Amino acid sequence: VESFRAIGVPVTAAETRAHMGLTKVEEIRALFDIERVRAEFERKFGRPAGEEDVQARYAEFQRVLFASLEDYTDPIPGVVETISALRAQGIRIGSTTGYTRSMMDVVLPAATAKGYAVDNCVTPDGLPAGRPAPYMIYKNMADLAIPSVDCVLKYGDTIADIKEGINAKAWTVGVVLGSNELGLAQEEVSSLPADELEARKADVRRRMLAAGAHYVVDTIAELPAVIAEINRKLEIL
């Protein structure tokens, strides 16, 4: 949002959220592909936006991001406890992200200091593509010596996450509360009328299921029960 505002072509939070989960440079390309944004850029600069404009906005995005990245590393409520419970079952935790390795070199130590640590983190660097392609999941499998995708569960809060899991042929679970797709901070969730909140949650659930999710949960605290159900299904097969 800030990188586009800097050139007088503002994008909305909703437009930005619609492309979350992709690599950051792909998010910027997607924003330039929005008809309104494309038209506003041409009106302001008298020419169509090109790849040099994508790279310029990406450079500005990185400048703004690195200045504040460490401030946005607080774990979502329930994440630390759930990961601990899953590890107690022998489950390994691999992460995929739209951030670059240099960005994650800032995020991971700060998150670890707050109790959130993964066994492996894969970024799009050096891979054919980021989300929704499955390569980061496959790289996690190789790094963690996971022999079969049947043993993999992809959990995420964006449509790109869901598509990544489905493209990898992995069990795929979407989360609603705190998600990019819901787009509400905890304070906003608490202040919304119950019927409006339920309607918004239902819309996110519908979109995630339409994208292929096998399960959609309200919070990560429900994940161990989902895994137990999947394990029962696998025992029957």
Label for each model-derived stretch:
Residues 80, 84-88, 100-237:
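Asp-based, Mg2+/Mn2+-dependent phosphohydrolase catalytic module
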Residues 19, 96-98:
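Structural motif
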Residues 13, 95, 216-218:
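A structural preference for short, hydrophobic beta-strand core positions in alpha/beta folds
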Residues 54-57, 95, 134, 151:
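A general marker of short, structured functional hotspots
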Residues 1-80, 84-89, 105:
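N-terminal helical cap/lid subdomain that shapes the substrate entry/recognition surface
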Residues 72, 96, 129:
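Glycine- and other small-residue-rich loops at beta-strand/loop junctions that grip anionic moieties
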